């Protein structure tokens, strides 16, 4: 069994050593331009077209939860990967736990009004504020995949009303499910906190725009943990300035790194982190990949395969 590996920023030697230990029967090598030798599996992130083109692969693993970059490259270069080759993504591998930590900490930050107290502190103002009531602090999750499910589970501990919206209806205990465009307005109408965990597809680009934000309750909060292209930044800034949206916590942006001149940096109601909400944990990723390859070799059914038509 031959495995080729390519990632522009990861510690390649660490990965090769870990993969060889996890899959002793495999010959693992770092792919370099000009390497056209045979391979059974490819582990990639932002791969060059020539790495995958023309190869008779058993499967390709994207080294992250999102596959929008490789799918967009496939649209421009369909010869890059044969359509029958399955493409897998890292559905969790520790990212679910990180998303839970991020979402819970920020929801509680808003619920306890720490954002308001920070603004008061900036003006040396001492004033206790009325508390929010949990039953009025409904949290809505846009995107009901593996990570959305994990975030919902973590928030249930705090007894907030929960709802989710996705392409198809879900049956999550304690979570009200909405599905399809026809139910989006009803979903948004009660969301004091909107958490975005949608996949990046042509249908979801720009979905968080003026029209969507207007359907939220006044003074709602936005937590974007998915992709920057989901948010029309000018529309969000207008909603923040008007008070329609009271605060936003943003981990992802249309341009990354976020340019220094972006007005988001200086907005008093915006908090920024540099795309760190959920980072691939190498040891857990290697365990998932080695387990999945073993299942594929046995002809077993596996999880995490990407539907290229849907985009996730």
From Swiss-Prot:
Keywords: Cytoplasm, NAD, NADP, Oxidoreductase. Belongs to the D-isomer specific 2-hydroxyacid dehydrogenase family. GhrA subfamily. The active site is at residues 227, 275. It catalyses: glycolate + NADP(+) = glyoxylate + NADPH + H(+); (R)-glycerate + NAD(+) = 3-hydroxypyruvate + NADH + H(+); (R)-glycerate + NADP(+) = 3-hydroxypyruvate + NADPH + H(+). This is Glyoxylate/hydroxypyruvate reductase A. GO terms for molecular function: glyoxylate reductase (NADPH) activity; hydroxypyruvate reductase (NADH) activity; hydroxypyruvate reductase (NADPH) activity; NAD binding. It is found in: Cytoplasm. One of its GO terms (cellular component) is cytoplasm. Its main location: cytoplasm. Its EC number is 1.1.1.79, 1.1.1.81. Catalyzes the NADPH-dependent reduction of glyoxylate and hydroxypyruvate into glycolate and glycerate, respectively. It is an enzyme of class 1 (oxidoreductase). InterPro entries: D-isomer_DH_CS, D-isomer_DH_NAD-bd, GhrA_Enterobacterales, NAD(P)-bd_dom_sf.
């Amino acid at each position: 069994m031959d495995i080729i590996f390519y990632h522009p920023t990861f510690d390649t030697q660490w990965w090769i050593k870990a993969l060889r230990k996890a899959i002793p029967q495999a010959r693992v090598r770092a792919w370099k331009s000009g390497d056209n030798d045979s391979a059974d599996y490819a582990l990639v992130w932002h791969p060059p077209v020539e790495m995958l083109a023309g190869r008779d692969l058993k499967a390709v693993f994207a080294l992250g939860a999102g596959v929008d970059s490789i799918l967009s490259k496939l649209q421009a270069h369909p010869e890059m990967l044969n359509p029958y080759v399955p493409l897998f993504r890292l559905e969790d591998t520790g990212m679910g736990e990180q998303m839970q930590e991020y979402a819970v900490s920020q929801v509680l930050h808003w619920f306890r009004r720490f954002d308001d107290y920070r603004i008061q502190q900036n003006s040396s103002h001492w004033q206790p504020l009325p508390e929010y009531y949990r039953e009025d602090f409904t949290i809505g999750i846009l995107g009901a995949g593996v990570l959305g499910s994990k975030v919902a589970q973590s928030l249930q501990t705090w007894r907030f009303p929960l709802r989710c919206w996705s392409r198809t209806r879900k049956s999550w205990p304690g979570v009200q499910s909405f599905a399809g465009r026809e139910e989006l307005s009803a979903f948004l109408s009660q969301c004091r906190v909107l958490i975005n965990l949608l996949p990046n597809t042509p249908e979801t680009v720009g979905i968080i725009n003026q029209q969507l934000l207007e359907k939220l309750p006044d003074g709602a909060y936005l937590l974007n943990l998915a992709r920057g292209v989901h948010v029309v930044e000018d529309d969000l800034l207008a909603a923040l300035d008007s008070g329609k949206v009271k605060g936003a916590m943003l981990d992802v942006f249309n341009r990354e790194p976020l340019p220094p001149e972006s007005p988001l940096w200086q907005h008093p109601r915006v908090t920024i982190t540099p795309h760190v909400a959920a980072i691939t944990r190498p040891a857990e990723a290697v365990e998932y990949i080695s387990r999945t390859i073993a299942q594929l070799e046995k002809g077993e059914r596996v999880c995490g395969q990407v539907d290229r038509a849907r985009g996730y």
